[in-house]
Amino acid sequence: MLVNLQTVLKMAEDGGFCIPAFNVYNMETVIGVLHAAEETKAPIIMQIYPRLMKEETGYFLSPVVLAAAARASVPVCFHLDHGPSELETTRSLRYGATGIMLDGSTLPFEENIELTRRVVETCSYLNVGVEGELGHVGTTADADMDEFTTPEDAKRFVEETGVSCLAVAVGTAHGRYSKPPKLDIDRICALRKATNNTALVLHGGSGVPDEEIRKAVAAGIRKMNFATDICYAFLDTCLEELQKPNRAVAVDNFMKKPIEAVKEFCISRIKLVGADGKA
């Protein structure tokens, strides 16, 4: 069933687990993610990058995600990931998104607050929750990767914007790590306390050691993003299949194993964050 961001976040908060948020790129990744959620009876988030939303892909992929969510036997939120502007968030709302991320993390603090507050106000009329970001979660190519989020800034940001959840910088990055990251668990605990237990979001979940993920969930992470490993699961399996002399030629048959690879990866993350059986 299609639900809004607030619904899955409340489920996670009440149950003390984390909602896995999987980035999808085509119909095959949507199918893999959906099958994983239904098989494990887990509430999930399917999210799309803004670059896909503003291309032809978004125009055609959004109805696929909405149809998958509508027929799903588990709660599914359709979420915009890293929306950089009001234009992008408005486009995603028109496409049917039930959750919006407004990423103003590279802006000056005051501008980030003001932009996020405006988007929260707009989305409130449609009962759509908003994820903000404070402290910059960079890429694995960045020298320092993060500008860590401080409890003082987080408290003010949450109070003045009214976000449903807050993405924080605590030691992760986007992309594939050259060495396993170590999360600042004490900072996560401090951020939760400062924000009156606001749902916190961890970006860059791909490649984080399992034990670090468990600690982060226990400390209060309620949404965790997985994108890079979705891509590797799909593409690596495609490459393996292409090397086989007797590979399927019909595209639908060829895609069965990549879909299965995405499903198996998602199942592993669903169980790791404790979302299995929570739908």
Regions found by a protein language model. Give the residues of each.
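Alpha/beta enzyme core
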Residues: 3-14, 25-52, 59-75, 83-198, ...
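Bateman/CBS regulatory modules and CBS-like beta-alpha motifs in cytosolic regions of diverse proteins
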Residues: 2-3, 269
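A short N-terminal beta->alpha junction/helix N-cap motif
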Residues: 17-25, 49-53, 253, 257
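Thr-Gly-centered strand-to-loop micro-motif
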Residues: 202-204
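C-terminal alpha-helical cap/extension of soluble enzyme domains
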Residues: 209-279
